[in-house]
């Protein structure tokens, strides 16, 4: 009897993850900071940068940019570069798409928490991110 439901084995081992760059800017006066926290336009942009470190390791950066505006005024800009350093477990068969998807699965939960906390502590609308659709993500090699 054979099992047709093969278990997926991860192709990457997370060695380290950390904030590479973080920026939160509030270009407006305090009067806009204290305004009602509803009816804002929030624009999110995600991208992934993958760079081979050597034949066994890869560095992947998840970039998240968030701009919040109200009535054509920028309330805040939040940018996060969250880096992961990974060991390739199956060097021969691993492709760039697999690296990107697995790396983002490792990095996104922590990046999501950082975005949430920074936006909340910045005094504005709290940004709560949902799971990413990795097929729509822009990849930069």
Predicted regions and their residues:
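N-terminal intrinsically disordered, cationic/polar leader segments
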Residues: 1-141
């Amino acid at each position: 009897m054979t099992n047709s439901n093969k278990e997926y084995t991860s192709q990457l081992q997370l060695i380290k993850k950390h904030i590479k760059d973080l920026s939160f800017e509030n270009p407006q006066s305090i009067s806009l900071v204290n305004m009602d926290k509803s009816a804002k336009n929030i624009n999110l942009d995600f991208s992934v940068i993958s760079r081979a470190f050597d034949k066994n390791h890869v560095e992947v950066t998840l970039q998240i940019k968030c701009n919040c505006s109200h009535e054509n005024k920028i309330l805040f800009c939040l940018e996060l570069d969250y880096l992961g350093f990974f060991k390739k477990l199956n060097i021969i068969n691993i492709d760039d798409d697999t690296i990107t998807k697995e790396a983002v699965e490792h990095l996104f939960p922590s990046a999501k928490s950082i975005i949430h906390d920074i936006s909340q502590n910045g005094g504005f609308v709290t940004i709560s991110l949902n799971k990413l659709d990795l097929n729509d993500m822009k990849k930069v090699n």
